[in-house]
């Protein structure tokens, strides 16, 4: 392995970047899990609100309760807004993670671009059983950044689309799960990358 100062500096930057990304990756996964109960609650409340709007209370024994239908509708809408607010807070967390990953990757790429002439192509492509090549790791970092960027956008769009349509809100848990399943291979790719650089990160 090359021991040029520029080469070592880029390796150190790569090591720090993966060290920074691993806890962000864990926080991302935990945040998505924390969304699930609120997605389910929001869906159930939307179903109840839709039923409340369809029923003619005047033709039921409940007609003796003045403004009951309006009161129930208000309570359900307030509960939906509460859950939607929490989901938007979770979305803000995902945005922060996405931005943090982009900043980490951007910093490494900048160091690489300013050092490439000093390192040389041969050293950039050099790898060992314990240390992936700089080229490989840079590509992996860009894959990770792209994954978070795309996933954040998809989650944001799902919450925006369901804004005023009860049927879309009811289907939100299923839509969210479909998005998760569609991205499962990319998610696994991130896991594999972190595993592939585990020995490299422990080396000095």
Curated annotation (Swiss-Prot):
Q: Where in the cell is it found?
A: Nucleus; Cytoplasm
Which of UniProt's keywords are assigned here? Cytoplasm, Nucleus, Ribosome biogenesis
What InterPro entries has UniProt attached to this entry?
CA109-like
Q: Which biological processes are named by the entry's GO terms? A: ribosomal large subunit biogenesis
Record GO cellular component, one term: nucleus
* Predominant place of localization: nucleus
Instruction: Provide the assembly information.
Output: Part of the 55LCC heterohexameric ATPase complex. Does not associate with pre-60S ribosomal particles.
Q: Function of this protein?
A: Part of the 55LCC heterohexameric ATPase complex which is chromatin-associated and promotes replisome proteostasis to maintain replication fork progression and genome stability. Required for replication fork progression, sister chromatid cohesion, and chromosome stability. The ATPase activity is specifically enhanced by replication fork DNA and is coupled to cysteine protease-dependent cleavage of replisome substrates in response to replication fork damage.
Q: What is this protein called?
A: AFG2-interacting ribosome maturation factor
């Amino acid at each position: 392995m090359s021991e040029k100062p520029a080469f070592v500096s880029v390796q150190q930057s790569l090591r720090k970047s993966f060290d920074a990304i691993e806890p962000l990756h864990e926080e991302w996964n935990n945040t998505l899990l924390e969304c699930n109960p609120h997605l389910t609650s929001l869906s159930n409340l939307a179903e109840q609100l839709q039923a409340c709007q369809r029923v003619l209370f005047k033709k039921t024994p409940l007609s003796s309760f003045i403004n009951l239908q309006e009161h129930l509708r208000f309570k359900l809408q307030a509960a939906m807004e509460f859950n939607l607010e929490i989901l938007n807070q979770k979305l803000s967390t995902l945005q922060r993670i996405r931005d943090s990953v982009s900043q980490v990757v951007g910093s490494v790429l900048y160091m690489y671009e300013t050092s490439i002439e000093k390192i040389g192509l041969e050293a950039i492509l050099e790898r060992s059983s314990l240390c992936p090549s700089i080229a490989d790791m840079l590509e992996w970092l860009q894959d990770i950044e792209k994954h978070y960027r795309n996933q954040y956008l998809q989650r944001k769009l799902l919450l925006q689309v369901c804004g005023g349509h009860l049927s879309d809100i009811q289907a939100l848990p299923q839509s969210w799960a479909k998005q998760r399943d569609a991205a499962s291979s990319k998610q696994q790719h991130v896991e594999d990358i972190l595993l592939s650089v585990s020995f490299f990160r422990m080396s000095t």
